[in-house]
Amino acid sequence: MRIINLFDMKLKDIISIVPLIKEQGFDAIQISPLQTTKDEEEFDWDKWWILYQPIDFNISNKRIGSSLELKKLCNFAHKYGLYIIADIVVGHMAGRDNGEVYPNSKIDKEFVDNKDNWRSFLYVDNWDDRYQVINRSMGLPGLNHNSVIVQDKIINMINNYIDLGVDGFRIDAAKSIGLEDEGCNFFNNITYNMKRNSNGELVKIVYGEVICSSNDLIDRYSKYMKVLTNYNYVGYNNNDAVIPFIEDKDNWYDPNINGLGWTNNLSTREIVRRYSNLTRIYDNTLFYPRISKDKCNEFEKAWLTDNIREANKVKIKR
């Protein structure tokens, strides 16, 4: 599956380019998170992180689009045989404006006041320590994924997405959510309680963000979903388990993030070349067309090149 990540593009604008996306050989479109965020009026490109600071589990975002627009996009994309994948933020909520790792005042007070909904507000200071990663907060107030209330809200949101026609999900920061062998039943319960789509089919496209991780950790998460990760952390033996990328929006927007910003130094042409190489090795790939830092919400045209179209046509022989 060849996925294009149209992060920060409005749903109505995506609708206008669906035919082109199909022509370029992509199979699926990953859209931005649609949960309500703490600052919905911030539209500058360098405020990209606001989309990952939700205050609820609703499906409507002033910056990206409404649930009605999402349904329209799904219906139109399906006519072209394209899947729509929703990016969902389920690891944390928005923090206070002063940077403290405590819930934002716009989050429902009853939800905030229930201490069982939250993990420790201590920061993760050792990313190689799994106990810290799944029990502490990553600079934002982390959710307790064993909480029945938290799970019910996330399951309800996922099923609302499915009702609107969404075909799959990217789970943001999945690496920070514990696994069954670590005492967390989150992924088991989420998978079990996903409803079927309008055709009576189970959702088949689910992948979690597990970047900068060992093959062992990738293998452990792949028991529950496919794993979205940066290509240089993947061994070839993981082909069916992973969805690798050369550059994602994090790397492009923030050169200092996770030590991955080195791709900022690569030309668009080099990004395309490396992506083309990925498609010769992996059945599933993700391509992020860089957004222009000079023209807000305008994407560079690399995804429209012949090289991308030819790369997406590659079928790997086993």
Predicted region positions:
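Short, flexible micro-motifs
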Residues: 68, 94, 211
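The substrate-binding groove and active-site-proximal loops of carbohydrate-active enzymes
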Residues: 1-11, 51-66, 95, 136-151, ...
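N-terminal structural segment of carbohydrate-active enzymes
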Residues: 1-83, 91, 101, 129-130, ...
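Active-site-proximal helices and loops of the catalytic beta/alpha 8
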Residues: 16-22, 33-35, 40-52, 73-82, ...
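Core domains of carbohydrate- and sulfate-ester-processing enzymes
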Residues: 101-138
